[in-house]
Structure formats: C-alpha cells, structure tokens
C-alpha cells in the first residue's frame, strides 16, 4: 500500500526524495519512485501560465512528462521529443551549493529534467556555451541537451548581491 501511495506523490518523486521518515524510531522507507538527479523525457505539456502548470501536474507521470510554460519553450526543442534515447547517461561530476557539473552522453537531442529547484539566477553552460534553463513542473529545472558527449555546468549568479556588493556603508 505504501508503495502505491509513494508512486502518486509527484512532488517528492521529481525532487528525488529517496528516503521518507515516518516515525523517528523506525527505519526510513525507501522511495523506489524517486526520479533521480536527472532524467530524459519524451513528452512535454505546454501551458500558458503557472496556474495551469500546477493543475496539469496532477495528470502526469513526471518520469515521462514535463509541464512547461509556453514562455520557456522554443520550437527548436520539438525534435528532442521524438527521439527518447534509452541509452542516455548523465552523471554528476561536481556538486557544491553554487555550482553543479554533469557529464552526459546521448545519441539524439534530449529534454532533460533536473531534480533541482528552479531559480532565475541559475545559469547553464554546455561545453562552455550558454544554454537556457527552463522551469518545469512548477518547481524544477529542465533543459534541451544536444546529442553527443558533453559537459554541463550550472552555476548560481546572484545578480542582486553582485550589484550591491560595491556599496558599503
């Protein structure tokens, strides 16, 4: 019964919650439905706004489908939806509070979800070239990744802090 309940908790699954503590004196439950730190999808539901995005979340399997607002989507990403690479591989090579690096390989372009909270101040580079990050499923990051073997670097650029840094009292 608990496994069925966990499979229906999209938010904790797409945020890669691997363990759930129900009572402090018991072993944590292993969540076999956690999506992982990054995964490719072959279906995207485009919606006009955040309210529609939240509504659609109840209808999807986050392992296969992302909900993305129209303003984040570019038509050139459509080719990635017809070519789900079952041999797609991605691994984290560096993880720190302000920077995450990955290596990935794919035989075709992919739409990839990342189990990291979306903030506009995060930027992404693929092999040193800027690439947009999309907000998906209301809270996580997603990106279009080209085919091949590539390095990804996501880093946090605190614009307000950097603007205020030269100001001293």
Predicted regions and their residues:
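Active-site-proximal, structured, solvent-exposed surfaces of multi-pass membrane proteins
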Residues: 6, 63-169
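Extracytoplasmic
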Residues: 1-85, 107, 127
């Amino acid at each position: 019964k608990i496994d069925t309940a966990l499979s229906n908790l999209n938010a904790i699954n797409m945020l890669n919650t691997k363990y759930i503590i129900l009572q402090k004196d018991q072993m944590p439950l292993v969540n076999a439905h956690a999506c992982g730190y990054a995964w490719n999808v072959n279906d995207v539901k485009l919606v006009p706004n955040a309210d529609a995005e939240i509504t659609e979340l109840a209808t999807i399997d986050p392992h296969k489908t992302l909900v993305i607002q129209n303003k984040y989507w570019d038509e050139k990403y459509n080719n990635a939806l017809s070519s789900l690479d079952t041999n797609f591989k991605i691994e984290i090579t560096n993880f720190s509070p302000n920077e995450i690096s990955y290596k990935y390989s794919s035989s075709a372009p992919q739409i990839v979800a990342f189990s990291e909270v979306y903030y506009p101040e995060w930027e992404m580079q693929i092999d040193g070239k800027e690439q947009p990050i999309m907000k998906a499923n209301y809270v996580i990051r997603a990106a279009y990744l080209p085919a091949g073997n590539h390095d990804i670097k996501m880093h946090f650029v605190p614009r307000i802090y950097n603007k205020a840094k030269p100001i001293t009292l």
